Regions:
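Nucleotide-activated donor-binding/catalytic signature segment of Leloir-type glycosyltransferases, i.e.
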Residues: 288-310
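Conserved nucleotide-sugar donor-binding catalytic segment
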Residues: 1-73
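Conserved catalytic-core segment of nucleotide-activated headgroup transferases in glycan assembly
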Residues: 111-115, 215-295, 401-407
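A donor-sugar binding/catalytic signature common to diverse glycosyltransferases
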Residues: 155-161, 311-354
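Active-site and donor-binding regions of nucleotide-sugar-utilizing enzymes
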Residues: 101-227
Length: 441
């Protein structure tokens, strides 16, 4: 009995002849786009519609050159809409004012430190804040950064990355497996991630309800924070670490004696070797065991080897080092916030699969080598760091909006949940590079 099938997005419409003939719409505007919009309004307000989450063709969009005619005719179209209809349409988009309560969901120390700058800004604005490890806990406003989340338990939800290399083995389409369409706001940390999102935004599952924004990476607001600098100086004094070139070892996973490889490759150089392992949860007891064993056989045996506790913020370690050595950890990206290069050892294995796989390092802002060449690569960076300026410049594209990240995030929360009026953050809203299209236009 239905006359209309609407496939994919609102740009893909298949109508039967009976429906078209019954419509009162005529091509009364010069703009084809406004004529189509007029027809679409009639369809939505008076007919039955079926939705399918599959588009037929995708085309790359090009910038529109002149919108004056369409803007004028759009205003004409809106002026002809019944006042009751217009009011009901506005009510659909208007969100109710929520309680000033924000719950931050985290499952590791790394996630906690990623979210903490936002929480501090929220507290300064009078929000009641809470951190929880229960990903299914109900919340008024929920801020998430995990692979698997439950935004349906929050009245308003935000999603951001917990890791700048997140899903790197699936780039550019992180969102096929980690879907954002259940959230209200999505946040990417910089230009390179914004480009990935734009390429995938034609898929419905990449689109939060209120949009995706290039707000930046919360931790990047803190790189010049006096608290981090003071904490770095305090740790350096506690370790009695001398003033000389310092190489930080910070892997994603500790396995297959990686720490041993690192120390043996560099122990005879006139440098500081600094180890900062991640604070793994108890469910990864085998990795915690590897970390403890490596420390037990190395600590105290080398005069230039220093350990920073796993529970310490990685920002402290990054403030102290001159370069980073890792496997595929996002620490290498975070080092770029401090203008420091990183080396990825590509033949170190990653045990998140069975059998373990080689490190996956698609990032173009990381210097890469095999473990047999690690010593020479470190010496090269120490003595000729200008060679790698192009790589460092690519890394700077990873971050946007430093110094204003948390402000813009909270402005968006205020705007959508508290009736806030500050909307300058809207300039950071992203648009798809492609759009769904059909073959019958």
């Amino acid at each position: 009995d239905n006359d209309i099938n609407l496939y994919g997005s609102l740009s893909n419409i298949l109508l039967n002849k009976k429906c078209v003939y019954s419509m009162q719409n005529k091509c009364i505007y010069k703009s084809d786009a406004i004529n189509r919009l007029c027809m679409l309004f009639q369809i939505i307000t008076s007919e039955k519609i079926f939705y399918m989450e599959k588009s037929l063709v995708r085309v790359k969009m090009s910038p529109r050159r002149d919108e004056n005619v369409e803007n004028y005719e759009y205003r004409q179209l809106v002026s002809n809409i019944n006042c009751d209809e217009l009011t009901s349409m506005n009510n659909i988009c208007k969100l109710p004012k929520l309680k000033k309560e924000i719950t931050f969901f985290y499952t590791s120390k790394g996630e906690y430190y990623n979210l903490k700058p936002i929480a501090d800004t929220a507290a300064n604005r009078g929000y009641k804040i809470k951190f929880t490890k229960d990903k299914k806990e109900k919340a008024e406003i929920g801020v998430y950064c995990q692979h698997v989340c439950y935004p349906e338990n929050s009245r308003f939800s935000l999603i951001l990355l917990h890791d700048l290399a997140q899903g790197h083995n699936r780039w550019p389409n992180l969102w096929e497996n980690e879907r954002w369409n259940g959230f209200d706001i999505g946040i990417v940390p910089g230009k390179s991630w914004a480009d990935r999102w734009r390429k995938c935004a034609c898929f419905y599952y990449a689109n939060p309800r209120c949009g995706t924004f290039e707000f930046g990476y919360p931790k990047s607001d803190c790189i010049n924070d006096i608290g981090i600098l003071n904490r770095g100086a305090e740790v350096k004094k506690l370790l009695a670490m001398p003033d000389r070139f310092t190489v930080l070892y910070a892997p994603s996973w500790e396995n297959d004696n990686k720490e041993d490889d690192f120390i043996k490759s560099l122990q005879n150089l006139d440098i500081n070797l600094m180890v900062k392992q991640a604070a793994w949860p108890e469910v990864y007891q085998h990795i915690r065991g590897n970390i403890e064993y490596m420390r037990s056989i190395h600590e105290g045996r080398f005069e230039n080897l220093y350990y920073i506790e796993p529970e310490e913020s990685i920002m402290t370690a990054l403030s102290l080092c001159d370069m980073v050595v890792s496997d595929e950890s996002s620490v290498m990206a975070e080092a770029l916030m401090f203008g420091k290069p990183s080396v990825a050892v590509t033949d170190w294995m990653i045990p998140d699969e069975d059998p373990p796989r080689p490190a996956s390092v698609p990032m173009d802002y990381v210097i890469k080598c095999e473990k047999k060449d690690l010593r020479e690569k470190v010496l090269s960076i120490m003595n000729h760091s200008e060679e790698y300026e192009d790589i460092l410049q690519k890394g700077r594209d990873t971050f946007s909006n430093q110094g204003n990240v948390c402000k813009d995030i909270m402005d968006a929360i205020d705007y959508y949940t508290q009736g806030g009026t500050e909307d300058s953050f809207m300039s950071r809203k992203l648009e798809s590079e492609y759009r769904a299209f059909n073959m019958w236009n």
